[in-house]
Amino acid sequence: VGGFDFFGKTMLVTGGSTGIGNAAARGFLRAGARVIVTGTRADAADYAGEDGNLDGLEYHRLDQGDAAAVAAFDPDIERLDALIVAGAKVAYRRQEFEIATFADVLATNLTGPMQLATKFRSALAGQGSIVFVGSVASFRGVIGQPAYSASKGGLLTLTKSLAQAFGGDGIRVNLVAPGLVRSKMTAVTWQDPDRLAATERQVPLRRIGEPDDIAGAILFLASPLAAYITGTSLIIDGGLSA
């Protein structure tokens, strides 16, 4: 991901240890920004061998579904130029039909993003951008995943609500909605050759997404090129929803 200049800017990427969040964090870093990332493990070294690269990034442990942890989270930030909320949770094998699991997924995917947005509102005021990482599930339900679907649908309307509430502070709020992207969370699909082939046949571009495909859109929405864009969602699914 290139072509952007974020020199002197400060970015916070939750869920920035792997996957889409890490791809966005590394894009900001290459463009000159100071980048703070969060993950759920105790130390950055605990991600060795994973699909991300934390070199040059400031790592903090944070479970964004834990309200007390978010309240106590205190990175060294006075001014924040972008908050990217990429942390997410999903449960398989019908676990999301259990109310405890349903609540746990919503805490990470919906309540956490709301708490983070309000927590850093003052630091973002005047120049900031919030980008939530939603999903094509923001627009339609996914069988077997009621919590994930509900949380991502809620995140879409939260984006619109906060765009109106925060606009007067000079804060833009947008959402990216990826289709199937190669990551640890989606490995159950792309690591199965038959499932992968079936999915790719449905995608006009005949491939699933890569984290960098989504990172480019995130960097755009956080950049001055998107200065008049707020309250919107950008679907990035290779044409699957066309």
Per-segment meaning from a language model:
Residues 135:
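Residue(s) in the substrate-gating loop at a strand-loop-helix junction
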Residues 207-236, 241:
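C-terminal substrate-recognition "lid" of short-chain dehydrogenase/reductases
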Residues 156, 173, 177-188:
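Short, flexible catalytic-loop segment of classical short-chain dehydrogenase/reductase
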Residues 167, 172, 229-231:
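Short, small/polar-rich loop/turn modules that mediate ligand/substrate recognition or access, typified
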Residues 91-106, 199:
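Substrate-binding pocket helix/loop in short-chain dehydrogenase/reductase
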Residues 117, 151, 159:
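Active-site helix of classical SDR
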